[in-house]
């Protein structure tokens, strides 16, 4: 009995009792009051709105500066164009070699080759016309070759009263050829198909011209293309009659080996100095 008690005591003494786990006190949670939370959110929102407002003001300022720069550029261009026009006017009329009529404008367009330029502008789209405010620009590709200022120099465009068309004429298909000129006779628009003017139709103008533009004065028919349908029709008819006569003449002279008038026709340069294609 004593032995059993002794063994029990030894076993009890050698048993390892697990140490009790003492829970650590948790850190207190810092809860932000609802009113303070709203203040933080409002602060972030205010900063975002402030940034957006600064960006908006910067954009407005940028647009304002850009608009002012563009306006100043147009004003300088207008002044330059007026100066160029006045300089050309002071030179007076000039005659081209061979006695051809030249009526200069700001862009120095030769009226005798105007139809060829129109043909390019309308059909080949080599030239394009852009209207911005009171300025008209003529481009060849992306290159600005003329700046026309639509100001009143005291010259008035030639206007003729429209004749009342008969019912028969009204039903006939009308040619869709139109040219638009400003008050100093410069081409500012075109639509339709135009023939190239034959340079033989361009002869010296009779009598001195007061200005280099002859929107108000007479010149010969070959150099009098001012955009009126009557003059254009006459020029087309003259060319068609001449082509018919030349065709009959060439048909009778084929045996002699002579070419047609079209083969001998010299191609004229355009206003920017390049030949017609």
UniProtKB/Swiss-Prot annotation:
A GO CC term attached to the entry: polar tube
Span list, region Disordered: 237-277
Compartments it resides in: Spore polar tube
One record GO biological process: sporulation resulting in formation of a cellular spore
Pfam families found in the cross-reference section: PTP2
Comp. bias intervals (Basic and acidic residues): 237-251
Keyword tRNA processing: no
Principal location listed in the UniProt entry: other
Listed Acidic residues bias regions: 255-265
Keywords annotated in UniProt: Glycoprotein, Repeat, Signal, Sporulation
Residues bearing carbohydrate: 134
Cysteine disulfide links: none
InterPro entries xref list: PTP2
Residues annotated as signal peptide: 1-18
Subunit structure, as described in the record: Interacts with PTP1 and PTP3.
Biological role: Involved in formation of a polar tube through which the infectious agent is passed on to the host cell.
Name the UniProt record assigns to this protein: Polar tube protein 2
Encoding gene (name): PTP2
């Amino acid at each position: 009995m004593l032995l059993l008690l002794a063994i029990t005591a030894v076993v009890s003494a050698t048993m390892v009792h697990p140490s009790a786990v003492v829970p650590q006190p948790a850190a207190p949670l810092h809860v932000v009051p609802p009113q303070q939370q709203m203040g933080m959110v409002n602060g972030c929102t205010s900063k975002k709105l402030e940034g957006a407002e600064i960006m908006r003001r910067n954009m407005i300022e940028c647009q304002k500066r850009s608009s002012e720069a563009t306006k100043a550029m147009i004003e300088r261009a207008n002044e330059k164009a007026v100066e160029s026009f006045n300089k050309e006017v002071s030179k007076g009329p000039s005659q081209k070699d061979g006695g051809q009529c030249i009526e200069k404008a700001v862009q120095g367009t030769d009226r005798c080759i105007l139809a060829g330029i129109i043909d390019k502008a309308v059909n080949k789209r080599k030239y394009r016309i852009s209207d911005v405010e009171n300025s008209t620009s003529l481009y060849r590709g992306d290159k600005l070759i003329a700046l026309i200022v639509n100001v009143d120099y005291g010259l008035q465009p030639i206007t003729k009263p429209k004749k009342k068309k008969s019912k028969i004429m009204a039903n006939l298909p009308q040619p869709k050829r139109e040219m638009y000129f400003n008050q100093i006779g410069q081409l500012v628009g075109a639509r339709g198909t135009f023939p190239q003017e034959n340079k033989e139709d361009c002869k010296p103008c009779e009598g001195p011209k007061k200005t280099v533009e002859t929107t108000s004065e007479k010149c010969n028919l070959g150099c009098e293309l001012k955009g009126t349908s009557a003059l254009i029709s006459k020029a087309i008819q003259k060319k068609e009659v001449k082509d018919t006569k030349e065709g009959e003449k060439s048909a009778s002279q084929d045996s002699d080996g002579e070419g047609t008038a079209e083969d001998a026709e010299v191609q004229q340069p355009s206003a920017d100095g390049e030949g017609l294609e």
